[in-house]
């Protein structure tokens, strides 16, 4: 059984829809010329304004500090990064997977996908960036994430 994502022939008045579980179904065409909740648009715009790329940050000093750290500090630091990677992989995907099928307005859908993007991509990429810069073979470190 396949589930139809949306029907382009369905005209939707998002200004009169519930935020979740509207009888008309999920968001079809994302239209933002008029929105029901301007505050959600502002939150989403603000979140996009915080966009950054981990590779923009130099970790030269951090890599040296890590080399000079004790084995205990290295273990705690690395274990934390691995757990943060696992956590953000889950918490970024989970809410989007659960809520987007029942979201009924485009401004909330956009905010949810933005949040998911930051959690799964920016945060996890940041941890990878750190590990790549402090370990010679980052793959060996990431391969221990399930240990």
Predicted regions and their residues:
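Non-heme di-metal
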Residues: 2-147
């Amino acid at each position: 059984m396949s589930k139809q994502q949306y029907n382009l022939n369905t005209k939707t008045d998002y200004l009169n829809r519930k935020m979740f579980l509207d009888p008309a179904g999920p968001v079809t065409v994302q239209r933002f010329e008029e929105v029901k909740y301007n505050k959600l648009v502002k939150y989403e715009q603000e979140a996009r304004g915080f966009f950054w790329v981990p590779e923009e940050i130099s970790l030269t000093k951090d890599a040296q500090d890590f080399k000079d750290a004790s084995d205990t500090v290295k273990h705690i630091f690395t274990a934390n990064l691995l757990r943060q990677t696992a956590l953000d992989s889950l918490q970024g995907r989970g809410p989007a997977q659960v809520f987007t099928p029942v979201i009924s307005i485009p401004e909330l859908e956009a905010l949810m996908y933005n949040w998911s993007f930051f959690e799964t991509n920016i945060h996890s990429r940041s941890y990878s960036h750190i590990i790549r810069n402090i370990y010679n073979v980052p793959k060996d470190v990431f391969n221990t994430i399930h240990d």
